[in-house]
Amino acid sequence: MAFRRINNLELFIKRCSAPTLYYSSIRTATGNNYSNNTANITTDSSSSSNNNSNRNNKNDNNNEDNNKFNWRSLVRFFVPFSLGAVASSLVMKRDDLELTPTISAARPSGRRREFNFIADVVGGCADSVVYIEIKDTRHFDYFSGQPITASNGSGFVIEQNGLILTNAHVVINKPHTMVQVRLSDGRTFPATIEDVDQTSDLATLRIQVNNLPVMRLGKSSTLRSGEWVVALGSPLALSNTVTAGVISSTQRASQELGLRNRDINYLQTDAAITFGNSGGPLVNLDGEAIGVNSMKVTAGISFAIPIDYVKVFLERAAERRKKGSAYKTGYPVKRYMGITMLTLTPDILFELKSRSQNMPSNLMHGVLVWKVIVGSPAHSGGLQPGDIVTHINKKEIKNSSDVYDALGCGDKELNMIIMRGVKQMHVTITPEDP
């Protein structure tokens, strides 16, 4: 009965995932059997024939003993194995308790956490930045059947109920178009223009959606030259793009930039701003918008409208909304040419000539074309980004206001003299009526 129970115990150990223990005990027993047989054969070799029966009896007895379960081998292997398993489980439980906070932590440590202040700024305000598309309702994509994108820009949410701030030149003076806004989460909504101030180049849009993340507005009056700033937007239609730099100047007068009828001291920054950044926020390290990205002259020289001036525009726009005045009745719409331009002041000309060898040395005035909308009259007429307009219909062009005057004079065609690098060229543009 005892031998049967031992055999049952061996079978239980073998079936219950202890093969190593089981086979170790069997191998030990087999090794003892082999040693005993070898000793018996050596001892009994001298009396070969006379002791055959005794040797057979001894071998039978040894085999019977070896077939019994070796308790000493079992204890030798089972006890350390059990203690190790218990200790391992305790260590695993302890490690789980200790490692849980570390695994769940998402923030980096060390120098990444200490010096990545730009990432902290972006994480707190990027969700409020939007991508603005101007769709041409007269031309449609061959494959999708959707209106093609005529232009694009940026903006940011300033009220949870869908009010968005951007540049005026992003959304107006583009006939036969519709405005679409894409949020940071990918949702797209049609937008309507609520208010426009062409003098300050500011506009507000409205989309029909609530509970949007809002950009906090800071104070541009407290800025100092050298402060870190972050520009967010969609340059070249690449949404959710982040660039960083410093404030180069907090008091860049509009007269220095050749912008007449604008009493604005622009913020100058070396943060990379290019096509599509217009209307996006310039943010301080507290995650507050301190400016609206407006224009770029060259690499390292860009300008933003101070947020203090923007707040005045927003207050006046709110008053106009209460009175029910609409954007179309308050602001005349000019003929459409499809360019974004910048007056070349003497200081800007000097800077451009020092940076590029393609600037003609005898150039004294003009307007820099730094963006041409695809499909626009300017694009069809042959204007390219980087061209400098010096004359329109035989009249000198000294600033951007001269170009606006030429658009409003009623001439059907605009015959331009431009500088493309060091070459002088003639182009003819037929503006579209509003």
UniProtKB/Swiss-Prot annotation:
The Gene Ontology CC terms held by the record are:
cytosol; mitochondrial intermembrane space; mitochondrial membrane; Nebenkern
Q: What is its EC number?
A: 3.4.21.108
Return the motif ranges for IAP-binding: 85-88
What SUPFAM superfamilies does this protein map onto? PDZ domain-like (SSF50156), Trypsin-like serine proteases (SSF50494)
Where is the sequence biased in composition, kind Low complexity?
35-60
> Per the record, which residues fall in region Disordered?
34-65
Keyword Chloroplast assigned: no
Does Transmembrane show up as a keyword for this record? yes
Protein name as annotated = Serine protease HTRA2, mitochondrial
Q: Which SMART domains match?
A: PDZ
**Entry annotation: catalytic residues:** H169, D201, S278
Membrane-crossing segments per the record: 74-92
Q: Name one GO molecular function term.
A: serine-type endopeptidase activity
Q: Where is this region: Serine protease?
A: 151-314
Q: List GO BP terms, alphabetically.
A: apoptotic process; ectopic germ cell programmed cell death; mitochondrion organization; positive regulation of apoptotic process; proteolysis; spermatogenesis
Which keywords, in A-to-Z order, does the entry hold? Apoptosis, Hydrolase, Membrane, Mitochondrion, Protease, Serine protease, Transit peptide, Transmembrane, Transmembrane helix, Zymogen
State the top-level EC class: hydrolase
> Which species is the source of this protein?
Drosophila willistoni (Fruit fly)
